[in-house]
Every structure is written in structure tokens, then in C-alpha cells.
UniProtKB/Swiss-Prot annotation:
Gene: HSP90AB2P
Subunit composition and interactions: Homodimer.
Domain of life of the native organism: Eukaryota
Residue ranges that the Swiss-Prot or TrEMBL entry lists as coiled coil: 315-347
Origin species: Homo sapiens
Protein name: Putative heat shock protein HSP 90-beta 2
Matching Gene3D superfamilies: 3.40.50.11260, Heat shock protein 90, C-terminal domain, Histidine kinase-like ATPase, C-terminal domain
UniProt keyword terms in alphabetical order: ATP-binding, Chaperone, Coiled coil, Cytoplasm, Nucleotide-binding, Phosphoprotein, Stress response
Cellular compartments annotated: Cytoplasm
Positions of the UniProt region annotated as Disordered: 145-192
Protein's GO biological process: cellular response to heat; protein folding; protein stabilization
InterPro entries the UniProt entry points to: HATPase_C_sf, HSP90_C, Hsp90_fam, Hsp90_N, Ribosomal_Su5_D2-typ_SF
A Gene Ontology term for the protein's cellular component: extracellular exosome
Amino acid sequence: MPEEVHLGEKEVETFAFQAEIAQLMSLIINTFYSNKEIFLWELISNASDALDKIRYESLTDPSKLDSGKELKIDIIPNTQEHTLTLVDTGIGMTKADLINNLGTIAKFQDQTEYLEEMQVKEVVEKHSQFLGYPITLYLEKEREKEISDGKAEEEKGEKEEENKDDEEKPKIEDVGSDEEDDSGKDKKKKTKKIKEKYIDQEELNKTKPIWTRNTEDITQEEYGEFYKSLTNDWKDHLAVRYFSVEEYVSRMKEIQKSIYYITGESKEQVANSAFVEQVWKRDSRVVYMTEPIDGYQLKEFDGKSLVSVTKEGLELPEDGEEKKRMEERKAKFENLCKFMKETLDKKVEMVTVSNRLVSSSCCIVTSTYSWTANMEQIMKA
């Protein structure tokens, strides 16, 4: 049976591992997580993935962020209950997925040291320098406060009347009072020192990702750490190269009206693609994008539209003679295109003669308003 607990204003259900699963997870954790800090970094990484997911989905469905939620990660240690809670505002699994696939791993005895403030800070500082989301640590702390004796008794009475824990209200505890005789009551009021509980918030990853900072402020060591984190190549990087769309536009020919780009899984894949043959032949340039989000993020720059060379409707600069030759080719191969369309039937929308190829015989393009072929593969995965 699940145990109901309260986290903030929401009710949360906690499901425990079955005995045999608990033994298996204990074996896995002690075998693969020999470095104990990894478990916390795994949770932070998962939270970051959940935030990435809702950010990506909001690009095509802005209503995903209608609630106005800030994309963030909160870390809440509780030394009394020996729990470490991570809360993100992203998209995760359904309740059924959580029950089937997850459990409360952080309660294992070896991980209790990460309830300490310095341990959490050390891990986050070490691993989160390339996360673009704020990570906030919430700690319950105590401080002494001096108030009048009457006010202290009033707050203490209210606390007993409510009979519940309230983190926002001070916990009253006598730690001392002014010594004075009865004759001095009218001259000076008694005061008491109380211990007041409060929640201390601290943003842990104040160092922002290098791509959001001025290039002049970034050291070679930071570039090296970023390269290793991004590529999992623990050798030093060879060089650093900056790319800007401004530079691309400055080198465009006057006849070129659009910025060409291609998306793919790697630089080698897009560089050897049939789609870039004609663009390179015309001495134009193509922007290689190897991150899935790139195709969503960039639509226009400085009044020039960004055009994918893998979609239909690609218009390359042509003079009068080239246009004439293209019309002749279309007329010459019109019957062949009809035959291929009839043969392929519903597998393709149309078959046309293209001016985008040089050495390749054919290519398959996507419609103007659909996903690119690379994005379709990602969504199917």
C-alpha cells in the first residue's frame, strides 16, 4: 500500500520496492555506482532531460507552458526523515510508469551523507556547469531571534492550538531572559530569545553555460571541460572555432536570398549528403546542424529565411540560361516521372526533376511544412 506524504501543497504517494527488487537494486547500486556521488548526478541529469522535453514540446505546442512554470530544479534535503528530494518542472513519466519502473533509491544507507549541505553543493558544482536550468538548494535552518516575553507566549500558544508543523512559523524555545526583579517591571519589559526555523534558498549553479557568455570571458580550461562533457572524449581538444550567422551572411553572394542549412546526426553524415551537392557547386555555403533542436530554433535571421536543403521547394539562384535548361529537362523526363509516381503510388507524394543534385541520381525530400528526415528518425526512435 502506498504511503501518503506531503510535499509543498501537493499530495505525493511513495511506493516501496518489493523485497527481491530491493536486494537487486542494492547489488546494482553497490556494483555500478562505486563512486557514490554518481547517484545524485544521475537524478540531476534526469531532471534536466525532463526540462529539455517540455521545452522541445513547447516549441510546437506553446500551451505546454501555459501554466507559466519556470524551468528549474530544486534540491530539498531532510535530515530528520533521511530523504533527499529533487523536484523539476519538466515532463516525466506517468504515474503507471513511475510505479513500474522507479523507486526511492536515495534512502539507501550509503547515500545519507548527501543530506549534508556541503556534499550536495560539491556534486552540483562539479557536474552542472553545462546545464542551462537553475538548480536551487532548499535547507531548513535555525536562527536566534529576540522578542518580547508577551509575544513569545502568544506565538507559543498559537502553535500549540494549531497542533501542526508549519515551517514558516518560529519554533519557541526559551534559551534565556533578562534577569530583573519585580520592581523593574514597569521600567523594562522582559525579552526572550527564541529559535526560529526558516527555509534558506541558494542557487548552486551560478556559473552559466559557456554558450550564454561572452567568448572573451571563457578560459581554455572551461573550453576543455565543455569539450570532454559534450563528446565523452577525455583527451584535450585540438582547437576552438566560433560560428556566427552574421559571418555567414557577410559572405553570401548578392544573388543568394536565403540561408541554407542541413540537419543530421553528425558532421560526416551531412557533409556527404546528396542534398548539399548543388549548393557547394554554386560556391554557396551550408550550415551544418547536428543538434535536434536546431531545426526548431532557427527560422529567420536579419530578414533572410533559413531554408532546409532536404525539403521540397528549394530555390537555388539561377540565371536565364539555367532556367531554360531546367524546363527542357522537365519536359524530357515528364513521362518517366509519371511512370515512377504510378509505380510508387501512395509511397510518395510526387516525383519531379530536380536541380539540387550533381553526381547522385535521386533523393527523397520532405514537404515544406513537415519534419526533416532527420527529425522523423529522432521521433520514431
